[in-house]
Amino acid sequence: MIEMKTFSAGWISEILLRNYVMGTIFFSLIHIPLYVSKSQGIKFKFNPNWPEKIQKLFTFNKQIFDNLFWSLFWGVPIWTAYEVISLWLYASGKIPFIQFSESPIYFFLILLLIPAFRDAHFYLVHRVLHFKFMYKIAHSVHHRNINPGPWSSLSMHPVEHLLYFSGVIIHWIILSNPLHAIYHLFHAGLGSANGHIGFKQMLLNDKHAIDLSNYNHYLHHKYFEVNYGNLMIPFDQWFGTYHDGSDELHQKMLVRFTKASN
């Protein structure tokens, strides 16, 4: 990490390239079989319709071009910026970090808690993004994707990217390790696919399939004002905004919407 004590184009460009390659491979491995070759048709697809060929709502009039633009032009660079700043802070000694050999139990504990912290951070940020002003200037870009696909995952306005990836700042505050910060950002960057793939499962063959997507978040894209969080911490159950697709909770949602409009 010695070279990371100062900002330089060399190591920064290496991290940016790595994130571009990893992100592109990851999302493409899901997108191509499901949305290009359509290897399983609409089997296990939440929305039986495919994205329209021409969609004036989207940048460049097409959902996939829109998603690629916001993800690659803004998403990956902002993800990388947070990683670069984190590594520079560690390498320059501006924040301390713990080695695995010093406290392996604490090291693993932080690693295990990152998904839970991300769940809480995502819920809080997501509620803020649904404030009228924030939705208008930023979050509306992401919510164009009523029928999301894998590349919709990081298709966000840069203001939303800044908030979405800001959870890594916790590692600037608590004692952790550069690997924790990197894992945290990968969990946010690649983990964003959960809930945006649009399919419950991907078929491997006639007998086997792998679970893919979070129906909970698909319903958020469909109804907007439900399921602000994920499922690890039940914030939506606690605050009355949960929807699981059942008729009972759908009716509760409609009643809530009616009250809010009066």
Predicted regions and their residues:
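Alpha-helical transmembrane segments of multipass membrane proteins
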Residues: 84, 165-173, 189-190
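Helix-capping/transition residues at the boundaries of transmembrane alpha-helices
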Residues: 129, 172-175
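Functionally important transmembrane alpha-helices
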Residues: 174-231, 238
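Alpha-helical and His/Cys-centered functional microenvironments
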Residues: 130, 143-147, 200, 221-224
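Non-catalytic, topology-defining segments of multipass membrane proteins
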Residues: 1-129, 137-140, 145-166, 229-232, ...
